[in-house]
Amino acid sequence: MRVARLKEAYPTAKVELWCEDEHRLGLKPIIRKVWSPVGERPLVKVHQRYEWTYLYSFVRPKTGEVHWLILPTVNAGVFSLALEHFAREVGAGTRKRILLVLDRAGWHTGKEVEVPEGIHLEFLPSASPELQPSERLWPLSNEGVANRYFEQIEELEEVLGERCVALCNKPELIRSHTRYHWWPKAA
């Protein structure tokens, strides 16, 4: 197991297991079913447009701790900035090692990705989103923007940011959605 190998390689460092994923949201609305009185049809204003923003999540399933970033795109450069920000936030370095589990998106595996000191990347098998705990966060993050109309992408980002702050204050909810029974308990 990779966690055990990291603990062996860095015996004086604390080792934590985290995972990361990105989620695209935009002005194309997320429509969900809702309850309504018998005989009444619920209406949702829709104006399909294709402008996007990306929600990056870094989650530690063991504790439910989560860090969110709302960024304009996904590519190796932006991913490197997200990694750098995350490493600073959690204090990764010589005394704290983070094993970060992620998918094999092109911007995760490219040669131009700059991985900060203290961050170690572990890639899941290709085409296996069911193995990624972060995937379970998207229905929670979508809750604040579902069935809503946004005129501008900035409005969506503001509501999304508020939802992410609210979710940061609910570690048990995050933990219950991301802590798989087979997820290593050691870190």
Question: PLM features: residue spans?
Answer:
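Short, well-ordered coil/turn elements that cap or connect secondary structure elements
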Residues: 12, 61, 95, 116-118
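A short alpha/beta connector and helix-capping loop motif
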Residues: 30-43, 112-126
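Acidic/histidine-rich, metal-coordinating catalytic segments
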Residues: 83, 94-108, 132
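Short catalytic/ligand-binding loop motif for oxyanion handling, primarily in non-cytosolic enzymes
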Residues: 26-28, 108-110, 131-133
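C-terminal anion-handling pockets and recognition modules
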Residues: 13-17, 134-187
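RNase H-like two-metal-ion nuclease catalytic core shared by retroviral integrases
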Residues: 52, 102-104, 122-144, 153-156
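Extended, low-complexity cationic-aromatic segments
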Residues: 1-84, 180-186
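A structural preference for long, well-packed, hydrophobic secondary-structure segments
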Residues: 2-4, 9, 80-96, 123-128, ...
